[in-house]
C-alpha cells in the first residue's frame, strides 16, 4: 500500500509539472499572437496616415 501511495504521489507531481509547462507554453503563444495583432494595427495606422498625407500634398498643389 505504501508503494502505491508513493507511485500515485509521483504521478500527481509529474502531471502537475506537465500541466504547468503546457500553460506557460500556451501563454507564450498567446503573447506572440497578440504582438502580431498590435504590429498589424500599427502598420495600418502608418499606411492610412501616409495615404492621407499623400492626398493632402496632391490636393495642395
UniProtKB/Swiss-Prot annotation:
Tissue: Expressed by the skin glands.
GO biological process: defense response to fungus; defense response to Gram-negative bacterium; defense response to Gram-positive bacterium; killing of cells of another organism
Lysine amide found at: 61
Propeptide stretches in the record: 23-44
The keyword Secreted appears for this protein: yes
Keywords noted in UniProt: Amidation, Amphibian defense peptide, Antibiotic, Antimicrobial, Cleavage on pair of basic residues, Cytolysis, Fungicide, Hemolysis, Secreted, Signal
Pfam families according to UniProt: FSAP_sig_propep
Any one Gene Ontology cellular component term annotated for this protein: extracellular region
Cellular compartments annotated: Secreted
Signal peptide as annotated in the record: 1-22
Family: Belongs to the frog skin active peptide (FSAP) family. Temporin subfamily.
Role noted for this protein: Antimicrobial peptide. Active against some Gram-positive and Gram-negative bacterial strains. Active against fungus C.glabrata 090902 but not against C.albicans ATCC 12231. Shows weak hemolytic activity against human erythrocytes.
Descriptive protein name: Temporin-SN3
Organism in which the protein naturally occurs: Sylvirana spinulosa
Amino acid at each position: 500500500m505504501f508503494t502505491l501511495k508513493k507511485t500515485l504521489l509521483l504521478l500527481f507531481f509529474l502531471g502537475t509539472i506537465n500541466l504547468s509547462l503546457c500553460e506557460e507554453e500556451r501563454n507564450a503563444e498567446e503573447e506572440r499572437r497578440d504582438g502580431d495583432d498590435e504590429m498589424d494595427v500599427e502598420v495600418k495606422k502608418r499606411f492610412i496616415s501616409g495615404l492621407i498625407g499623400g492626398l493632402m500634398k496632391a490636393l495642395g498643389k
